[in-house]
Amino acid sequence: MLTMGGLDVESVEPVAPAFDKIVVGRVLEVAKHPNADRLTLCKVDVGGGTTLAIVCGAPNVVAGMKAPVAMVGARLPDMEIKQVKVRGVESSGMLCSAKDLGLSQDHSGLLALPAEAQLGADVRRVLDLDDQLITLKLTPNRGDCLSLLGIAREVSILTGSPLAVPAVAPAKAALEEKRGILLQDTAACPRYCGRIIRGVDAKARTPDWMVRRLERCGLRSISAIVDIANFVMLELGQPLHAFDNRAIEGEVIVRRAREGERLKLINGQEVELAPDVLLIADRKKPLALGGVMGGEASAVSGSTVDVFLEAAWFNPSAVAGRARRFALSSDAAFRFERGVDFAATPEAIERATQLILDVCGGAAGPISEAVATLPQRKPVRLRSSRASKIIGVQFSDEQIAGLLKRLQLPHARSGGEFTVIPPSYRFDLEIEEDMVEEIARLHGYDNIPSRPPQAKFTMLPAAEGRRTLSELKRILVDREYFEVVNFSFVEAQWERDFCGNAEPIALENPIAAQLDVMRSSLMGSLVANLRFNLARKLDRVRVFEAARCFLRSSGGEDPRDPARALAGYHQPLRIGGLAYGPAAAEQWGVPVRPVDFYDVKGDVEALLFPREARFAPLAHPGLHPGRAASVSLGGAAIGWLGELHPRWQRKYDLPQAPVLFELDVAGLAAVNMPQYREISKFPPVIRDRSMEFDEGIPVSGILEELARNRPPLVQNIRLFDFYRGKGVERGKKSLAFRVVMQDTARTLTDAEADAAMAQLTELLAAKFGAKLRT
């Protein structure tokens, strides 16, 4: 039930293992064993006029004490009791320790039972051992369930049973004395209650029932006053603290710590405080870490006569993280970090006062209270239609109203809309989805039908004029590249070295000290991949990555561009690759040579095919000054390729320079649509022409000019030879072009072919000053 209600039950265990025939007995006489120094002979009254002779080895056995007696035939967790002789003396049973009963690991002596326990009564009933210990694994937002009251409230909600909260009558003030309270930090502590109780017996014995309940909740008994404070915390969820009233000088002050201030805590640890730590102090000194742990100097002890009892509400933000900073763990901090009911503070101090007066005696004064601005619970809107849509179950307005009533949430209704005022103990109810969750868990998660979502999908035809990222990746994989996936954050030094980026986009909270900036290029990550593989003895590496890079926006981007996802920043999707080592995998039929610029240029051209890119010399901080090129399509730059700069090759300990490229995916996606062209049935005419050009004229510019201004008969022009040397002037180069001419209607004559070649020669001479080489 609790698990399905949202409170995860981690385990349900009995508080004691199974055993029977264990009764309450009183030790009447204790005599020395005749044959053993460490054993005693005990006469034990087990009620009903029955007296047993039992041999016992416990050091704490004394006449008059009451202890558990295992009768002959009793079954304990580890043994069965029989009538036996112990060193020649008959023993009719066994006096038991807590370990014998499986209640704890304490085997130092007999388990002493309360003096009022009835002789012969079943120990399971006397110690309330037929109980179950339920361990809950609460989520951080359910701090309201860190108490018996909170769990009882949930059970009431889930079952519909009425919640019976024991009434706590205000203690009648037998004193007029009050201690002043000053709140210097009202945001961190807007409510503080305190009460003086004089004449307490600090050495009073904690009731057995309270000790048992504390132990079952994982708390050890310390002293009656401290035990009562802990018990009320478990019962109502409000942490309390008891000060020795004599240790407080003047009024109680809630303030921030001063730089360098120190406090010794009740666990013996001395801590140095910082100004963001909340303190409970008096006029002269700190007394406690607010909401975390008390100080040793002001703690109650066996000599305490007067107590100042504290109950306060601390803002979770003022307590969160403070215990961890000092390596502390306290139940109070655990609760205050998650949120405590700020309306229940007076009730908690009244309950603790009642128990202290009952157990320790004394006289209570009136409650001193300082209250500033308490948290205001903002109304939360809940629509029936919204709840039905999210949960997948149709709820009527009346059903929603009924569920809110069971949840004990005050609300106002207007049609199908409810305005809910979250109670003071529910800090987790802030938005409409929180309320929908409450409706769902109360309705029952197992009552929500399993309905797979249904949607109509229409397959859209793939655009012929665009390629997907998967297609681009497949091209590189076919060319022996392996895909890698790297972090988008890199070392700042990589950005400075490879990109010349002196001010990369810095991360506020990097996952590692060295990964502190966002990358503006894939280059650094690919070089890191290369070094990783070289360290593992690979001599041929081909890797690529398709990912976003991060740049500061220049302001000229299209606001509809998906790469401009955040104002002020540009996040283009790029594909980059790196090639290193032999151009081809080693095999007997191919000479071994290192990969070069032109090998990777071929890979880039394969990515762009059937479109033709323009490659132009490029100065790039990460690339070799003479072996780098920009890549343009349709007059727009889309990336670069080149060999790594020798400086970075040496710095990053690379035996040879890799060749890299990086292209914008947006520029690669578009492809030319195929155009129909009639296939000629007439033979082509093929002519070669060799021309001399100035050394500085790029071949790409020549080919582009020929493509733009070729005669209609020319179908294709291709460079097939390049020559420098004998017969060519210094500062000149010889380029040989193969020209294919063809007509779809007739066979070309030599005169027509000669005229077309002459036209091309004149074009090159006029545009580039080229001379026909004879």
Where are these regions (language model features)?
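Class II aminoacyl-tRNA synthetase-like tRNA-binding/catalytic domains
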Residues: 81, 253-293, 297-300, 447, ...
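Terminal amphipathic helices with adjacent charged low-complexity linkers/tails
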Residues: 155-184, 360-387, 393-394, 435
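Phosphate-backbone binding interfaces of nucleic-acid-interacting proteins
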Residues: 1-175, 308, 324-327, 331, ...
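Extended, well-folded interaction surfaces typified by the phenylalanyl-tRNA synthetase beta subunit core
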Residues: 150, 380-541, 687, 740-744, ...
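Conserved mixed alpha/beta core segments that line enzyme active sites in large multi-domain catalysts
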Residues: 10, 26-53, 211-212, 229-297
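Mobile "lid/hinge" segments at catalytic clefts and subdomain interfaces of large enzymes
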Residues: 90-100, 106-112, 123-125, 132, ...
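Glycine/proline-enriched, intrinsically flexible loops and inter-domain linkers
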Residues: 159, 163-261, 354
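A carboxyl-terminal module marker
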Residues: 389, 406-412, 419, 428, ...
